[in-house]
Amino acid sequence: MPDIQILSPHLADLIAAGEVVERPASVVKELVENAFDAGARTVTVELRGGGATYLRVTDDGCGMTPEDAGIAFLRHATSKLHDAQGLEAIGTMGFRGEALAAISAVSHITLTTRRRGAPGGTHMTLDAGEIQDMYETGCPEGTTMIVRDLFFNTPARRKFLKSDRAEGAACAAAALRCALGRPDVSVRCIRDGEELFFSPGDNKLDSCVYSLLGRDLAMSLLPCAGEADGVRVHGFLSSPAAGRGSRAQQYFFCNGRWIRSAALQAALEQAYRNTLLV
């Protein structure tokens, strides 16, 4: 037998899942971004504990046909990219077709979806990426995804999850970042029956910030905007008096997507160098 072996599809899926799904917050990010790409105007994130046991994302987006639902959890299945030329014009949050396959490989999933204008919907259950049941059902337009027992078949991954408190906070933070990047979509986050935040979805960044980050912070912010070389920048900056000793509430977005950027952080801190201790 040769030393080099081709991985089984199941093992390849588990490895890929480890790259895409690091913790429950990764699932929140991927499912909320999928809802945005589906044209949702409202998204609700519900979790219990830290999100590993139970996590539900509901949207009123375009939904899926039974045919699309049947292949949505296969690796490299995507509705967002069809040829190489499309790579030059990607305008969606995701396009690789890996997230749903990765999530389903390490969890139990219940999907309920109905295409806009369709007379009925589809209910489907999956265990470790394998479809267990699929049938027609009545449901609202849009999609509801329930993810249970994340990492049930990869105990080493589950062992390294933090406390429910920490994982739940990370899930809420992921949903909040998504909401800040899309003030045109109403996002609600609920943990153990308690609403953590709600954004109005009125496409006004100031009211979005007010709802998500609180009145005191919102009232201390100063609007800023500029454009150069085809790049437009807009947002809010805090007054020096409202400065904080950490970067915890520095948020940068590119085309609606939250990003980490050491260069942008450095530029921001350089601008404040004479007024803040950073």
Which residue stretches match the model-derived regions?
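N-terminal phosphate-binding caps/lids of nucleotide- and nucleic-acid-binding domains
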Residues: 1-278
